[in-house]
């Protein structure tokens, strides 16, 4: 009841939290309760990851510089995070943002990603912001008919171009992959052809793997 919430004391451990530690919002405070009532839950929880290998030795193993930023599960949490991090056009060359379903790591070695592949869209420098945002909204809003096949999305900033990619689970499921590719182009109003590369093919090829599917 409201009376109980208002009279409940603040968390006893507030003074004991280490610097930088996020307070637990489950303490029953009126503000937290109000936030939970008004929040709009997403069908899946998602985690933002950041990879900035700049300044790292080339000998560092691929994927070792990727680290999670924050996991969100409501519309409000998404916008709070998105509005407080750099957009892709502001990132250093070589950096990547990843947004993957919670518990899935944005790595080929992750068991859920291992048999999958990715659709990729390339664009000019500074042009990826809109594509990235619209891709995120389509993902967290569950706009894809084969949404269960999707692992997450990546935006990559490189010297001469920027790329946005959608990673999927099962490259052999041609029906699902073609549907995802076509719908993604529709959501972004993207007119050029895009290709789907299987992760296993990419790992075996030093010069770039051929597209398994094209839409």
Curated annotation (Swiss-Prot):
GO terms for biological process: defense response to virus; regulation of translation; translational initiation. The keyword Transport does not apply. One of its GO terms (cellular component) is eukaryotic translation initiation factor 4F complex. It is found in: Nucleus; Cytoplasm. The keyword Cytoplasm applies. Changing residue 161 to K: In strain: Sukai Golden and Mikamo Golden. In allele rym5. Residues 16-27 have a biased composition (Acidic residues). Disulfide bonds join 113-151. InterPro entries: TIF_eIF4e-like (IPR023398), TIF_eIF_4E (IPR001040), TIF_eIF_4E_CS (IPR019770). Its main location: nucleus. Pfam families: IF4E. Residues 1-35 are annotated as: Disordered. Residues 40-43, 50-86, 134-143 are annotated as: EIF4G-binding. According to the redox status, the Cys-113-Cys-151 disulfide bridge may have a role in regulating protein function by affecting its ability to bind capped mRNA. SUPFAM superfamilies: eIF4e-like. GO terms for molecular function: RNA 7-methylguanosine cap binding; RNA binding; translation initiation factor activity. Component of the protein complex eIF4F, which is involved in the recognition of the mRNA cap, ATP-dependent unwinding of 5'-terminal secondary structure and recruitment of mRNA to the ribosome. Recognizes and binds the 7-methylguanosine-containing mRNA cap during an early step in the initiation of protein synthesis and facilitates ribosome binding by inducing the unwinding of the mRNAs secondary structures. Key component of recessive resistance to potyviruses and bymoviruses, including barley yellow mosaic virus and barley mild mosaic virus. This is Eukaryotic translation initiation factor 4E-1. It comes from Hordeum vulgare subsp. vulgare (Domesticated barley).
């Amino acid at each position: 009841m409201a009376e109980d919430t208002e009279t409940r004391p603040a968390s006893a451990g507030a003074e004991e939290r280490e610097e930088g530690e996020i307070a637990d919002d489950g303490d029953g405070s009126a503000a937290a309760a109000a936030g939970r009532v008004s929040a709009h839950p997403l069908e899946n929880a998602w985690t933002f990851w950041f990879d900035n290998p700049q300044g790292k030795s080339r000998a560092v193993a691929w994927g070792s510089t990727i680290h999670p930023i924050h996991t969100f599960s409501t519309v409000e949490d998404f916008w709070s995070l998105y509005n407080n991090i750099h957009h892709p056009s502001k990132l250093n060359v070589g950096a990547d943002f990843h947004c993957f379903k919670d518990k899935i790591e944005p790595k080929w070695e992750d068991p859920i990603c291992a048999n999958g592949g990715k659709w990729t869209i390339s664009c000019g420098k500074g042009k990826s912001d809109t594509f990235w945002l619209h891709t995120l909204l389509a993902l967290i809003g569950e706009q894809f008919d084969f949404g269960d096949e999707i692992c997450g999305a990546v935006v990559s900033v490189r010297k001469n171009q920027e790329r946005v990619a959608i990673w999927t689970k099962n490259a052999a499921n041609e029906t699902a992959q073609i549907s995802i590719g076509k719908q993604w182009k529709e959501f972004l109003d993207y007119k050029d052809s895009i290709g789907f590369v299987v992760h296993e093919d990419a790992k075996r090829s030093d010069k770039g793997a051929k597209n398994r599917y094209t839409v």
